[in-house]
Amino acid sequence: MAPPGMRLRSGRSTGAPLTRGSCRKRNRSPERCDLGDDLHLQPRRKHVADSVDGRECGPHTLPIPGSPTVFTSGLPAFVSSPTLPVAPIPSPAPATPLPPPALLPPVTTSSSPIPPSHPVSPGTTDTHSPSPALPPTQSPESSQRPPLSSPTGRPDSSTPMRPPPSQQTTPPHSPTTPPPEPPSKSSPDSLAPSTLRSLRKRRLSSPQGPSTLNPICQSPPVSPPRCDFANRSVYPPWATESPIYVGSSSDGDTPPRQPPTSPISIGSSSPSEGSWGDDTAMLVLLAEIAEEASKNEKECSENNQAGEDNGDNEISKESQVDKDDNDNKDDEEEQETDEEDEEDDEEDDEEDDEEDDEEDDEEDDEEDDEEEDEEEDEEEDEEEDEEEEEDEEDDDDEDNEDEEDDEEEDKKEDEEDGGDGNKTLSIQSSQQQQEPQQQEPQQQEPQQQEPQQQEPQQQEPQQQEPQQQEPQQREPQQREPQQREPQQREPQQREPQQREPQQREPQQREPQQREPQQREPQQREPQQREPQQQEPQQQEPQQQEPQQQEPQQQEPQQQEPQQQEPQQQEPQQQEPQQQEPQQQEPQQQEPQQQDEQQQDEQQQDEQQQDEQQQDEQQQDEQQQDEQQQDEQEQQDEQQQDEQQQQDEQEQQEEQEQQEEQQQDEQQQDEQQQDEQQQDEQEQQDEQQQDEQQQQDEQEQQEEQEQQEEQEQQEEQEQQEEQEQELEEQEQELEEQEQELEEQEQELEEQEQELEEQEQELEEQEQELEEQEQELEEQEQELEEQEQELEEQEQELEEQEQELEEQEQELEEQEQELEEQEQEQELEEVEEQEQEQEEQELEEVEEQEQEQEEQEEQELEEVEEQEEQELEEVEEQEEQELEEVEEQEQQGVEQQEQETVEEPIILHGSSSEDEMEVDYPVVSTHEQIASSPPGDNTPDDDPQPGPSREYRYVLRTSPPHRPGVRMRRVPVTHPKKPHPRYQQPPVPYRQIDDCPAKARPQHIFYRRFLGKDGRRDPKCQWKFAVIFWGNDPYGLKKLSQAFQFGGVKAGPVSCLPHPGPDQSPITYCVYVYCQNKDTSKKVQMARLAWEASHPLAGNLQSSIVKFKKPLPLTQPGENQGPGDSPQEMT
């Protein structure tokens, strides 16, 4: 059996190149990723390879003969996978199942037979997965079924679980695939998400089968399938449902492979069988394996590079093939499980060296459970080294079982989503993981149980060997491979399954019972056939159950009385079945693989079909190990009754050489066997029920196992009678086997042609790769040139940016110069304006002086006229006085009249004073100037007119009058704002200081300005914003609102009058700021206020800059410079 390191460690220890990067994301080491390659290369890992092969990528994944392109194992299974060494087997199986298993192979393709063999060949992994998977597995039935369901239960337990994978993997084997599905369903639970990822990857990689197909090359794709399977088988304890598939993936891969791949499972089993049965067969298988391994390694190396991704897809397909092979082999390997385990152990030792290295890495990542299985195998092979590793792996198994539950869920998703590869991987992984989970419950202490299992495994191989020695040609050839596989697989599976069988023989008896239950769906037909088989072969149902249990419990059965009896019964069954395979191998190689695939479906339906398919799988393995087939023929002679039944089955297989003939014959034979085995299986069902109880109670398991051993002994007696009948049938089967061998040779030739075609395709692929590399190099050169151009462009852009910066600097300098020029121009313009203003003022003063002079001249003329009039009046008065003198009385009266006249003049002068009061009202100088001549005009009334003004002039000195008359302001001149508007605002100490009507605006501006409104002691007052409009009231509220530490508004003022008298007056307010940014923000604040308050008037604004800072730093200075634009420069 495979060295303890077989799975991960042998792969690692082998140091086989871990080329597979895609093997599993979970792979703890790149080596595990290469498990597939290492597994193929390493014989140590026979068990691991069996489990790994079936589960992971191993020969089982390789077995996808149908798709040589998909898998390197697509080549004759022996060629593609070192464990495949039995090429003849692949040739018979490939006739029908190969292509479907190739694409669908792992789970659904011809994997229907695979499930039985699968648990056996994966015995380590599958037995673990079936039995360990059973307790931890989602359903004990599914877990128990996988051995049974692997033969028959696959449709039953795995049909509910796996149907999607089967549908995905192989529509032809969809019934088979549905059985994988349950493990996949369970496997998603147990599988870690990483396992699902690796499974998905392997699905992707598996499509490129050729690279993955080579188990020997173990192109990372090939090994990754094992990794997936091993990881899945280990990780998904649910795999127990699929454990058959998990086993199938290792062994089951061979059935789907069986055309080419069956050599892997069979090769793994047949080399072990050859070693146990015929060493020469093993040597031949090993030699074929070594040759194919070298070829596959080349292909794998090529395909690994080109097809690592494909390898994943191929792995998924290989896993499908493995599962299909597992189904076929599970059927046959349940019977041939011991043989296949031994053969698979030997083939797996080689393949495990290659595959186990890859699978070990993959399995380690995939499942520490598989590591436990590997360690169990290693414990058998390297019990001491592996016991420690098993301790670790036992812990890992528990962790992996948890991961497996997650992975089972993930795989359910993957199987639903990920198609065949994931399902098969999940199934195998679930089987493997169910095995580890079951191993954990049953291996609860994997180390202890492993040693126990190793002991029982060793004992079982010993028991099996004695039992095999009793039927040694039967069992040694069959069970020694099976024991080797069981011992390897049983070490792995028996360690888990010895854990399980010992712990789970009740549990596996329950699985057997559950398997009948699981078989009931899967074996419900089989059980119906079992009753039939129990009638004809109740020993075989027990044998099948034991064999199925042996896939699950072959270790336990071999380990325990049931194992001994089923081992004997299995040898009996395996002898006829192996005789049938021998006879049926030529006939059944094509039909058997087809039949195995169909029989897997039927055997999933029927236990005997499972057994027969196990026989067929064993036959495939026997076909791979033709020498073992001789041993099996000897066993067949011993099991002539079974062989006769198997001869009938072989005749049925001959009738159904196209899958259905053999299946029908096998169904008929199996129905006969079912009649015999219905009693046996009824007994076994009772035993399995006892085993289920024993799964609950290990002690009951032992008692039930003893009972089962007794029943099996009875059945063996019945089987001995049947063996005599089978011996007759075996002779017929031998003839059929010869025909099958011829067909196998033809298939081998076809496989060789396919290999040559594959090589040509690989060469073409290499050429394409080289061309692609050249194109890539050219692209890289172009990219480098583009990068250089980009760098040059960047440099040019940088230079342009520098030039732009320089231009900007020049522009800034120009702008500064322009600003300076503008300032100078402004200064010049202001100076000119001031000069013009001064000149205008001087002119106005001169005009005023001239006007005053003219007025004075006019006044002088008026005074002269008045003097003349006064002189004339005096003359008249003198004349009157003379007359008065002449007439004294008259003279007195005249004097009185003169005195009366003087007051009139005075009154007139007073009226003239009133006129002076009227002058201010009559604001025009013209009226003032025209009034004296108007007075002068009425000379007739000297008293009212001229006398008034004259006296007015006399009494008001002319120099004073011009000052009064200088007020020449027109009526329409703009008036200054009312004094209440002109009061400069005082800074507010608190908000209440702000007038109530201006307070909302003040608060709004304070929030808007924020920090900008605060006083900055470092800044000076050099900026202002001038707001102007026609509403002095709104401007007053604005000036009251803009009162902050860094923003201060002056009082309301008015702009200079534009010119025409009737133009409206424009009022303004200056808001002084400390910097330009604040002044801009003040403008924005007013615009924001106007936007939110439609009734507020729209004010125009402009920013003003001062050369010299304004003295606004002291808070005490309440200056409102806003009213004087002179402050602006």
Swiss-Prot record:
<dbReference type="GO" id="GO:0019058">
    <property type="term" value="P:viral life cycle"/>
</dbReference>
<feature type="compositionally biased region" description="Pro residues">
    <location>
        <begin position="161"/>
        <end position="185"/>
    </location>
</feature>
<keyword id="KW-1100">Inhibition of host NF-kappa-B by virus</keyword>
<feature type="compositionally biased region" description="Polar residues">
    <location>
        <begin position="924"/>
        <end position="934"/>
    </location>
</feature>
<feature type="region of interest" description="Disordered">
    <location>
        <begin position="1"/>
        <end position="988"/>
    </location>
</feature>
<keyword id="KW-1048">Host nucleus</keyword>
<feature type="compositionally biased region" description="Basic and acidic residues">
    <location>
        <begin position="292"/>
        <end position="301"/>
    </location>
</feature>
<feature type="compositionally biased region" description="Pro residues">
    <location>
        <begin position="85"/>
        <end position="104"/>
    </location>
</feature>
<dbReference type="GO" id="GO:0085034">
    <property type="term" value="P:symbiont-mediated suppression of host NF-kappaB cascade"/>
</dbReference>
<feature type="compositionally biased region" description="Polar residues">
    <location>
        <begin position="207"/>
        <end position="217"/>
    </location>
</feature>
<feature type="compositionally biased region" description="Polar residues">
    <location>
        <begin position="139"/>
        <end position="156"/>
    </location>
</feature>
<feature type="compositionally biased region" description="Basic and acidic residues">
    <location>
        <begin position="314"/>
        <end position="323"/>
    </location>
</feature>
<feature type="region of interest" description="DNA-binding domain">
    <location>
        <begin position="1008"/>
        <end position="1129"/>
    </location>
</feature>
<feature type="compositionally biased region" description="Basic and acidic residues">
    <location>
        <begin position="472"/>
        <end position="528"/>
    </location>
</feature>
<dbReference type="InterPro" id="IPR048523">
    <property type="entry name" value="LANA1_DNA-bd"/>
</dbReference>
<feature type="compositionally biased region" description="Low complexity">
    <location>
        <begin position="529"/>
        <end position="596"/>
    </location>
</feature>
<feature type="compositionally biased region" description="Basic residues">
    <location>
        <begin position="962"/>
        <end position="979"/>
    </location>
</feature>
<feature type="compositionally biased region" description="Low complexity">
    <location>
        <begin position="431"/>
        <end position="471"/>
    </location>
</feature>
<comment type="function">
    <text>Multifunctional protein that plays a role in the replication and long-term persistence of the viral episomal genome in dividing cells. Binds to mitotic chromosomes via its N-terminal region and to a 16-bp imperfect palindrome within the origin of replication (oriP) located in the viral terminal repeat (TR) through its C-terminal. Tethers viral episomes to chromosomes during mitosis. Plays a critical role in the shutdown of lytic gene expression during the early stage of infection by interacting with host TRIM28.</text>
</comment>
<comment type="subunit">
    <text>Homooligomer. Interacts with host BRD2. Interacts with host RELA, ELOB, ELOC and CUL5; these interactions induce the proteasomal degradation of host RELA. Interacts with host TRIM28 and NFE2L2/NRF2; these interactions are essential for the shutdown of lytic gene expression during the early stage of infection. Interacts (via N-terminus) with host histones H2A and H2B; these interactions are essential to dock LANA1 onto chromosomes. Interacts with host BUB1 and PCNA. Interacts with host NAP1L1; this interaction is required for LANA1-dependent DNA replication.</text>
</comment>
<feature type="compositionally biased region" description="Low complexity">
    <location>
        <begin position="263"/>
        <end position="275"/>
    </location>
</feature>
<feature type="compositionally biased region" description="Basic and acidic residues">
    <location>
        <begin position="48"/>
        <end position="58"/>
    </location>
</feature>
<dbReference type="GO" id="GO:0045944">
    <property type="term" value="P:positive regulation of transcription by RNA polymerase II"/>
</dbReference>
<dbReference type="GO" id="GO:0042025">
    <property type="term" value="C:host cell nucleus"/>
</dbReference>
<feature type="compositionally biased region" description="Acidic residues">
    <location>
        <begin position="597"/>
        <end position="888"/>
    </location>
</feature>
<feature type="compositionally biased region" description="Low complexity">
    <location>
        <begin position="186"/>
        <end position="197"/>
    </location>
</feature>
<protein>
    <recommendedName>
        <fullName>Protein LANA1</fullName>
    </recommendedName>
</protein>
<keyword id="KW-0238">DNA-binding</keyword>
<feature type="region of interest" description="Disordered">
    <location>
        <begin position="1110"/>
        <end position="1129"/>
    </location>
</feature>
<feature type="compositionally biased region" description="Basic and acidic residues">
    <location>
        <begin position="28"/>
        <end position="41"/>
    </location>
</feature>
<keyword id="KW-0945">Host-virus interaction</keyword>
<feature type="compositionally biased region" description="Acidic residues">
    <location>
        <begin position="324"/>
        <end position="419"/>
    </location>
</feature>
<dbReference type="GO" id="GO:0003713">
    <property type="term" value="F:transcription coactivator activity"/>
</dbReference>
<dbReference type="Pfam" id="PF21501">
    <property type="entry name" value="LANA1_DNA-bd"/>
</dbReference>
<dbReference type="InterPro" id="IPR037007">
    <property type="entry name" value="EBNA1_DNA-bd_sf"/>
</dbReference>
<dbReference type="GO" id="GO:0003677">
    <property type="term" value="F:DNA binding"/>
</dbReference>
